[in-house]
Amino acid sequence: MPVKEKAALLVPSGTYHEPDKKHLHIICSDPDAKGLVVIVGISTYTNDLCDQTCVLQAHEHPWLRHQSFVLYRKAEIVSAAALQARIQSGEVLECDEVNAQTFLRIKKGLCKSPQTKRKVKRYLGC
């Protein structure tokens, strides 16, 4: 699967206690002329201190097991080629795309969230 908007990936994000843990990440843009894309992670919703911009329910993606939220503060602009290399090496795993409605909520949230970095917002034209 090529690196493109709506693609969902499982990216290594383990902790000291769970080094093999992976979190769902969503690619939020197609590669630009420089081959860059925006990617954002999804994390477990634990309390009301989590970013409320885009809260997801377990039924919104097969990988989600419980209520989650989009971790806009860690949104990044990354090289699509580097991401593709990580996929080909098996470090990053591909999974089912996000449905169109959920993806729209995630993408709109990049501009709405107060936690999205300024450089990501500028890149997206927010």
Annotate each predicted stretch with a short phrase.
Residues 1-3:
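Mixed-charge, Lys/Arg-rich low-complexity intrinsically disordered regions
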Residues 5-8:
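Loop/turn positions that initiate beta-strands
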Residues 10, 38, 55, 69-71, ...:
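Generic structural signal for residues positioned in beta-strands
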Residues 12, 17-63:
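Compact nucleic-acid interaction/catalytic patches
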Residues 60-126:
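C-terminal terminal-subdomain/extension
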